Amino acid sequence: MLFFLLVGTFRFPKTMKIRYSAEVDPDVDYPKQEFLDLLQIYLADPDGWESKGYTFIYDPKGPVKIRLSSPATIAKTCGLPGNLSCAELGGRHLYLNASRWKHGAKASQLPLDSYRQYMVSHEMGHILGHEHVKCVPGKPAPIMLQQTLGLKGCTPNTKV
């Protein structure tokens, strides 16, 4: 059995303002500023978690740590196959897979920019306490469906 989440104990204040920091791991060849700029765009998307009342604020010392990490780091840190990303359920640590960030996931049927949006929203969903869900075939895939692994009869979707 594979575990796709780390378990955390952090709980957000009722204000629903989430302060986060962002890093690109030293073994990942990707410009940090570009990563940060894209994160800010994806987290502020009106169809993302902001539609549920969350506001995301970049703060270099923020309690939520978002990292662009190599597949090897994710495998070691999260105990997962190197083709996935991971986050703590209700926690503070979110690891985005650098290979997926650069190339996407064919099984998701999403273009790269949309896949990145999905990836950020899905993993942030875990930070916010949401677990994986199933889908209703023919309907848009819920953001918490593991679209990286396939759509299970749903249509591709990036909306929360």
Protein language model regions, located:
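Catalytic Zn2+-binding segment of zinc metalloproteases
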Residues: 123-139
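Short alpha-helix carrying the canonical HExxH Zn2+-binding catalytic motif
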Residues: 111-125
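Structured segments of extracytoplasmic/periplasmic soluble domains
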Residues: 41-50, 127, 131, 147-150
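Active-site-proximal beta-strand/loop segments in catalytic clefts of secreted hydrolases
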Residues: 23-26, 67-71, 97-99, 130, ...
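Active-site scaffold of zinc-dependent metalloenzymes
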Residues: 81-112, 138-151, 155
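Amphipathic heptad-repeat alpha-helical coiled-coil/stalk segments that mediate oligomerization
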Residues: 158-159
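A metal-dependent hydrolase signature that marks the N-terminal structural subdomain at the beginning
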Residues: 3-77
